[in-house]
Structure formats: C-alpha cells, structure tokens
A protein has these predicted regions:
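N-terminal subdomain of lithium-sensitive/metallo-dependent phosphomonoesterases centered on the IMPase/IPPase/PAP
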Residues: 1-110, 286
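Residue-level signal for inorganic ion chemistry
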Residues: 43-46, 68, 79, 113, ...
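A short, compositionally biased
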Residues: 50, 123, 151-155, 245, ...
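Solvent-exposed alpha-helices and their adjacent loops that cap or buttress functional pockets
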Residues: 56, 97-99, 132, 150, ...
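Generic detector of well-ordered alpha-helical packing
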Residues: 69, 73, 92, 109-112, ...
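DPxDG-like acidic metal-binding loop motif
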Residues: 99-158, 173
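An extended, acidic
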Residues: 165-286
C-alpha cells in the first residue's frame, strides 16, 4: 500500500461508527482519566522510593517493578468500581489480548519503566476504552509533569482541557521526528537501523524518549511532526492512537494499513508528514 493509499485508508477516525453514544463516550473518558490519575498517584509515590524498589526482567531489556504492578492494581480498582462487567487488558496481568467484545479497557500502568527506574522523568500512565472493538475514549498522563492528554471518538483531542491539533509543519527539513528503538529481537534491529540515515539526513532531528504513549501524545499536540516504531503492544498504543486520530493526524502500520489496537508496527503524524515518513521508511529515501 502506498502512502497515499494509507491516507485514504485512515481518514482520522475509526472505520466503524462509534459503538458507544456521545454520553457513554464522555462517561468512559471520565473513567479513563480517573483511573490514569489514580495510577499516576501510585507512580509518583513510588518515584520517591526509587532507589529501594524491587524490579526484575520480563525478557531481554524489558523490566517490571513493583510500582508497575501497584499502579495497575490501583487503576483496575477504579475501573471495577465504575464498570464491574468490563474487561481490563493491561501490561502486567491481563486476559486474552484478543478480547474485543463488550467494554474493554486497555492500559499501561507505567509506560517508560526503564526511564522511571533510572530517575529519568519521562514516563506515563495511559488507558483507553473500547466498546465492541471500537475505540471510544482515551487518556494519557505524563506522570512527571502532570500533563493530561484526552480524546473521545468523534469528540476531538484535548491537552490540559484545550483542543489540540497535529503540527502544521510540512517541510521535512523543519520537522522533528520521534521514534522508539527495537531492543529485544535481532531481526527487528537489523530492519530498523537502515531506516535511520534517510530520516536523519532529511529532518531537523530524531528523538527517542523511551515512552511511546508520550511520543504519540506529542504528535497529537504538534510537538513532533511524526513518529514510528517497529513493534508496540496494544497498551502502549491504544490511547495514543485515538489522540492522533482525533487531533487530525494519520496513524498506520509500516505496511500502510490502518493501525489496530494490537501488537503492531506504527507510523503516526500529520497527514503530510505521515505520508512523507512512510515513504521514506519503506523506500529508504524521501
């Protein structure tokens, strides 16, 4: 699929009509915000005792701490109180990742765990609500700064309560691009590294901050012109996907297909810069 085909395939909203009413989407957003805020409280408290925290490896360079688990438990309690019949799909302990029926919340209780463990103040709590597989609402909180990014399907995206839009910069030479490094699979590292030179030569810079949920939020609010990563989990992606779409951006896989709430590759940006980045990544040249 070409970049232009991708733009047509991903018009900025879910292909399906929202499965929830406007009032239901607003109520689900309120739950997302409350749950994310509760998780963020736990993470902030954990940051104060960071040097003594217990943490372990889930896989190659993939870490989890007691704070991840405590944050997930806290946000799960908020969801259970408000929506006792809902399913929670979260990073540290979740049911079948293929669950799409009914009301499903998808959450990362601490996106940017490695940053958190090293005292780098760039990590988030992020959560989205889906109704019968269709994104309805999402919220991401930058725990270190307190910045809140929210969106509802068809209702737009907001930052600190104000509407937000993707960047209007269309010249790659003036653009700032975000990315995430592959770290656990050798074949993905081999695929990723050749992508860098073409993007580096044509843009004002590349940033790798280590928290995809915040990268996508920053695309949605116009700080970055575009973002790409070879593999994201549904909890990394769900809220950010809705933020970018509702802020007027495009988000697809590296194949140019509409981005699912699943383990997938991701290319996101303003319509012009998404098309440019997708072409550059696929062809190796602007």
């Amino acid at each position: 699929m070409s970049a232009s085909d991708a733009s047509q395939a991903n018009s900025g909203t879910d292909a399906a009509m929202p499965a929830a009413s406007h009032a239901e989407r607003r109520a689900l957003l309120a739950t997302c915000v409350a749950a994310a805020a509760r998780g963020a409280e736990v993470v902030r408290a954990g940051a104060e005792r960071r040097p003594t925290l217990e943490w372990e490896s889930k896989g190659r360079f993939d870490f989890v701490s007691e704070v991840d688990r405590d944050s997930e438990s806290a946000l799960a309690d908020v969801i259970a109180q408000r929506h006792p019949d809902a399913t929670l799909l979260a990073e540290e302990g979740s049911p079948d990742a293929g669950t799409t029926r009914g009301l499903v919340f998808v959450a990362d209780p601490l996106d940017g765990t490695t940053n958190f463990l090293h005292g780098v103040p760039w990590y988030a709590v992020t959560i989205a609500a889906l109704v019968d597989g269709v994104l309805a609402a999402g919220a991401t909180i930058n725990v270190a700064t307190g910045a809140l990014f929210t969106a509802t399907a068809g209702g737009g995206a907001r930052h600190a309560g104000a509407p937000m839009r993707v960047s209007g910069i269309t010249d790659p030479a003036r653009s700032l691009i975000a990315t995430g490094f592959p770290f656990s699979r050798e074949e993905e590292i081999a695929r990723y590294v050749p992508m860098l030179p073409a993007v580096m030569r044509a843009t004002a810079g590349i940033r790798r901050a280590g928290a995809a949920a915040l990268d996508l939020a920053d695309v949605a609010c116009g700080r970055y012109e575009a973002f790409w990563e070879l593999r994201l989990s549904p909890w990394d992606l769900a809220a950010g996907l809705l933020l970018v779409r509702e802020a007027g951006g495009l988000i697809t896989t590296l194949d140019g297909a509409p981005c699912p709430v699943a383990e997938t590759s991701c290319v996101a940006g303003s319509p012009v810069m998404h098309a440019w980045l997708l072409q550059t990544l696929v062809n190796g040249e602007p």
